[in-house]
């Protein structure tokens, strides 16, 4: 190992360091990292840093040292477009400029030691520039980024900040969050003056392969705020949106939804499909009395199979109500009164199934009753 660093003034550090034949060992064995070289230069009011290794290369140049670069990114992005995220005002923009480029190679050895389960594909690249006018442009491209069984394939991220706003567009060929799989995804986030717009589209385009459509178009508007005690809060509502699961189209609409100080309120969140409906109203609070009401009308239980990772053969139609009662209430937990027709599990008929729960105050417990009726025989 060779190292020679000197602080020349303020935040600037110059010098270089070289480490040969790095090998890391853990319970899974030996990880060959190889050589690492870092060089830091400063001149003409520009700081330059170069990182070289077999798993990644990076270059940085800026009118401030890299520690100031991180602070300035906040200044021209989230602090400007979403000021409610911060209690203090922070520092202003000082007409600095920056350029950053990172290119990944085969990083499996170093990631398996420092971040087990993480994978970043060879040739993944990040480029970021900030002009003296505070204009940001950034792009991340990757064939695949994964963590365990979750991954993004064909990822392309674009970020900029025109006219005091912040915009990000994240697209991918494939997004997998077990058990969900979405293809041709496109997520847009836009923020200005604490107002946030979210647009998300996906289309698996598998009708010809499976005979069923799975796609979605979701639209959400939100406003960030702080209450009188400076607690962070958010108010949001769905614009007319839709999602198609196994060719069943669901329309999504809502009035206002709000979360602040460990308390959530939902007004008129509705998921509707021909012949079935889910409505959610009310609230939930960690330290207050409140109740969230969920009403089901002829809900197709087979949709649950899409979210279990395996096909358990669940089927039937559910109608009734569920109440989620906040933990600080006298009767915390879930109250149910559901009637399920033509119910089945694992391919076996269960018939008409009734599920109910009530709170027994003296014993401080829930009593749950589950009865089914098959061809007039009750169990």
How should these model regions be labeled?
Residues 1-379:
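Interface amphipathic segments
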